[in-house]
């Protein structure tokens, strides 16, 4: 099902945060930001991630579980493994997603199904299992990574936009469900970022996207990571059920 690589001891910690999709540019930045803020992080991705790839010279600890989050039936055991090996999580960042694009009338059904499974079903099911630990502790944080595409139309991203809109609806309703137990649930909606997901768009498209932003550039990955770290903090204890946008003003 999955394999484990760890530099952390198997002790429960109230500041343990699980981050999915840490093999990507945004997920790695989120993990690094949390570690620098003093959290212990367990990353999940299909590709193994060495601690040095995430932490650099920071003072925190990073552990990794290699798993396919698209395997919905295996998520229950994955959650059990995380709790058994690393302790009860304080926070969860649902970052892993796939960005399949294309005009909807010509997309294969299998591509649509995979996108919905990875971007919607998987984070909902993982949240189901890991928030059980937060409920018993009566404290916790859930941050879902959405996208400006959830609110602003982009050509060729109908299915992707639907998946991100679903996560924002999930965020608002889950905040109502578990808020009385001291758990906040929020979403962060990045605009286009300078990561591997935009590297193949071509110069003309990249220029057009940047001109659309009020600041005339892409949003910075580190800025998104900082927003996630803020939402994990005690300073954000009264922020729940909302989506915070980091897009250099592209939706202004």
Segments from the language model and where they lie:
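Active-site helix of classical SDR
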Residues: 127, 163, 171
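C-terminal substrate-recognition "lid" of short-chain dehydrogenase/reductases
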Residues: 124, 217-246, 251
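Residue(s) in the substrate-gating loop at a strand-loop-helix junction
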Residues: 147
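Alpha-helical segment proximal to the catalytic Tyr-Lys
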Residues: 132, 176-180, 237
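Active-site loop immediately N-terminal to the catalytic Tyr-X3-Lys motif
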Residues: 105, 152-158, 180-181, 216, ...
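Conserved glycine-rich cofactor-binding loop
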Residues: 23-24
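Substrate-binding pocket helix/loop in short-chain dehydrogenase/reductase
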Residues: 103-104, 108-116, 198, 209
């Amino acid at each position: 099902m999955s394999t484990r690589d760890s530099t952390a001891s198997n002790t429960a910690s109230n500041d343990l945060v699980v981050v999915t999709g840490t093999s990507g540019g945004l997920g790695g930045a989120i993990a690094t930001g949390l570690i620098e803020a003093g959290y212990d992080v367990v990353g999940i991705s299909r590709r193994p991630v060495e601690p040095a790839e995430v932490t650099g010279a920071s003072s925190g600890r990073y552990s990794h579980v290699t798993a396919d989050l698209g395997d919905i039936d295996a998520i229950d055991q994955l959650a059990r493994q995380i709790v058994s090996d690393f302790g009860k999580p304080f926070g969860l960042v649902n970052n892993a997603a796939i960005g399949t694009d294309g005009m909807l009338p010509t997309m294969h059904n299998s591509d649509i199904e995979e996108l919905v499974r990875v971007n919607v079903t998987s984070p909902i099911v993982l949240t189901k299992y890991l928030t059980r630990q937060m409920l018993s502790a009566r404290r916790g944080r859930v941050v879902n990574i959405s996208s400006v595409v959830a609110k602003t139309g982009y050509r060729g991203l109908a299915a992707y936009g639907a998946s991100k809109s679903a996560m924002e609806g999930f965020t608002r309703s889950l905040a109502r469900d578990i808020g009385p137990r001291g758990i906040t649930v929020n979403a962060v909606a990045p605009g286009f970022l300078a990561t591997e997901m935009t590297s193949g768009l071509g110069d003309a498209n990249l220029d057009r996207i940047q001109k659309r932003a009020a600041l005339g550039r892409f949003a910075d990955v580190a800025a998104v990571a900082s927003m996630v770290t803020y939402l994990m903090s005690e300073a954000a204890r009264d922020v729940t059920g909302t989506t915070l946008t980091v897009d250099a003003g592209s939706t202004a």
